From Swiss-Prot:
It comes from Dichelobacter nodosus (strain VCS1703A). It comes from the Bacteria. Its main location: cytoplasm. It is found in: Cytoplasm. This is Probable transcriptional regulatory protein DNO_1179. GO terms for molecular function: DNA binding. Gene3D superfamilies: 1.10.10.200, 3.30.70.980. Belongs to the TACO1 family. GO terms for biological process: regulation of DNA-templated transcription. GO terms for cellular component: cytosol. Keywords: Cytoplasm, DNA-binding, Transcription, Transcription regulation.
Length: 244
């Protein structure tokens, strides 16, 4: 159950970088959209959306912004037909990358994603070419844990699949459909995650050479900045000396 989680360190570092870049709202809006897309716009019947709304409110997001994101995901915006599209490909150093998009113009999105891959030395692959290297999971990250035993007991009682400890931090893994329920149960037990989301998690990380690190980081950043992109995940394991 316990063990060093290099992924947690990488994920948490990325979360801090995202905050510095002012991407918190973007990520919250995307989660509202995706949650509504998969579970509908009724927060009473959609625990993942309920959690996303709670997070957005905590960051003082306006009601209008939240409602538009939810309607966009649920397909309730007049005259707008949204389509989910997934792209898979490889970046420098053989890094596997999955890009999930929500778009009203598939041709535009394909062109933008392909351009990013091409410009940064990557290649788009066919459907399924890298997906087998990832698993969808709910992830809850705790930065400072005072009582590991209590957290482990609460997590397992809430239905978590696994929990990994690394020094004072902890990473709890759940099935995607149990993510919101586990989160809410842990809050009731007195544990609130510092970071949490449903994401694709690489089964194994792929080492990035120092020579390729900057280009891989640039590719991931370019993809994340595209308007139609909902999420970008990779199995990149950047060298410690890389400061990108």
């Amino acid at each position: 159950m316990a063990g060093h989680s290099k992924w947690a360190n990488i994920k948490h570092k990325k979360a801090k970088e995202d905050a510095k870049r002012g991407k918190i709202f973007t990520r919250l809006i995307r989660e509202l959209t995706v949650a509504a897309r998969h579970g509908g716009s009724d927060i009473n019947a959609n625990p993942r959306l309920r959690l996303a709304v709670s997070k957005a409110q905590a960051e003082n997001m306006t009601k209008e912004t939240m409602e538009r994101a939810i309607k966009r995901g649920a397909g309730e915006l007049d005259g707008v037909q949204m389509e989910e599209v997934r792209f898979e490909g490889y970046g420098p150093s053989g890094v596997a990358i999955i890009v999930d998009c929500l778009t009203d113009n598939n041709n535009r999105t394909v062109g933008e994603v392909r351009h990013a891959f091409s410009k940064c030395g990557g290649n788009l692959g066919t459907s399924g070419s890298v997906a087998f290297q990832f698993k969808e999971q709910g992830v809850l990250f705790f930065e400072n844990v005072d009582d590991e035993d209590a957290l482990m007991e609460a997590a397992l009682n809430a239905g978590a699949e696994d929990i990994e400890f690394d020094d004072k931090s902890a990473e709890i893994l759940t099935a995607p459909e149990e993510y919101a329920n586990v989160y809410e149960a842990l809050v009731q037990a007195g544990f609130t995650a510092d970071e949490s989301e449903v994401t694709l998690r690489a089964e194994n990380l792929s080492a990035v050479s120092l020579e390729d690190a900057e280009q891989v980081a640039r590719l991931l950043e370019m993809l994340e900045e595209l308007d139609d992109v909902q999420s970008v995940v990779s199995n990149a394991d950047f060298p410690e000396e890389f400061e990108g």
